[in-house]
Amino acid sequence: MKKKPVAQSERQHTLLENPCAYGLLSQFQAATVVNCFTLNKII
């Protein structure tokens, strides 16, 4: 139970150190959501 907050804080610390990586991740997540939505619409 105590490991989860630590992992989250470490992840946030890494994102703060690498804002560019965070931007790329958010863009990738947005693209994935759009692709899934488009695929579901076609099917």
From Swiss-Prot:
Family that this chain belongs to: Belongs to the YqgB family.
Keywords, sorted A to Z: Cytoplasm
One Gene Ontology cellular component annotation held by this UniProt entry: cytoplasm
Listed name of the protein: Uncharacterized protein YqgB
Compartment annotation: Cytoplasm
Pfam families, per the entry: YqgB (PF11036)
Primary location: cytoplasm
Organism, scientific name: Shigella flexneri
Top-level division of the source organism's lineage: Bacteria
